[in-house]
UniProtKB/Swiss-Prot annotation:
Residues 19-57 form a propeptide. It comes from the Eukaryota. Expressed in entodermal epithelium along the body column. It is found in: Secreted; Target cell membrane. GO terms for cellular component: extracellular region. Keywords: Amidation, Antibiotic, Antimicrobial, Immunity, Innate immunity, Membrane, Secreted, Signal, Target cell membrane, Target membrane. Residues 1-18 form the signal peptide. This is Arminin 6494. Belongs to the arminin family. Its main location: secreted. The modification Alanine amide is found at residue 82. Antimicrobial peptide with a broad-spectrum antimicrobial activity. Keeps its antibacterial activity under a wide range of salt concentrations that mimic physiological conditions of human blood, which is surprising, since Hydra is an obligate freshwater animal with nearly no salt tolerance. Does not affect red blood cells. Coiled coil: none annotated.
């Protein structure tokens, strides 16, 4: 709601001090474009933050890819070899 009031206020200022209709039109267009770009930057920052949260678990995905059924028979051999130091 604040952005709407800001745009309307800037439009009022532009109408007050403008020399012609084209100047007013250009000023309003520039302000609206600026607001849109700022909003897009904020949204992209939010999306980047979410992407970082999602990617936090990715380093552990390799654990899920291990074929544990194939490795289980070798575990006692590894434990025995480690105990014979």
């Amino acid at each position: 709601m604040k952005t709407v009031f800001a745009i309307l206020f800037l439009a009022f200022i532009a109408l007050t001090y403008a020399r012609s209709y084209e100047d007013v039109k250009e000023e309003i267009k520039n302000e609206v474009e600026k607001e849109i770009l700022e909003d897009l930057e904020e949204e992209s920052d939010e999306l980047n933050d979410k992407r970082k949260e999602i990617n936090d678990a990715k380093p552990w995905r390799w654990v899920r890819r291990i074929r544990w059924k194939k490795l289980i028979p070798y575990i006692p051999v590894v434990v025995a070899a480690a105990g014979k130091k």
